[in-house]
Swiss-Prot record:
Residues 21-26 form a propeptide. This is U8-lycotoxin-Ls1w. Its main location: secreted. One of its GO terms (cellular component) is extracellular region. The keyword Secreted applies. It is found in: Secreted. Belongs to the neurotoxin 19 (CSTX) family. 08 (U8-Lctx) subfamily. Keywords: Disulfide bond, Secreted, Signal, Toxin. It comes from Lycosa singoriensis. Contains 4 disulfide bonds. Residues 1-20 form the signal peptide. GO terms for molecular function: toxin activity. Expressed by the venom gland. It comes from the Eukaryota.
Length: 77
């Protein structure tokens, strides 16, 4: 009986480890890829930058972008 319980726990640990590795190996997001819910998994040469979206002074959401590291973006009028 103890052997069955131990085997079950070991199998559970192995499956959990495999799922965690698969989560870490997700494809990275390319440049200018937009995510609206949360910062994404940008590729290694990019950085994630998030901005709030507002309408009439009320926050209506958030956009996150994968942008080049070290590049400064300025708003043009």
């Amino acid at each position: 009986m103890k052997l069955i319980i131990f085997t079950g726990l070991v199998l559970f640990a192995i499956v959990s480890l495999i799922e965690a590795q698969a989560e870490n190996e997700k494809a990275c997001l390319p440049q200018y890829q937009v995510r609206t819910d949360a910062p994404g998994n940008c590729c290694s040469n990019l950085v994630c930058d998030c901005y709030g979206r507002y309408k009439s002074g009320a926050r209506i959401g958030r956009n996150c972008f994968c942008l080049q590291k070290g590049v400064i973006y300025k708003r043009e009028n």
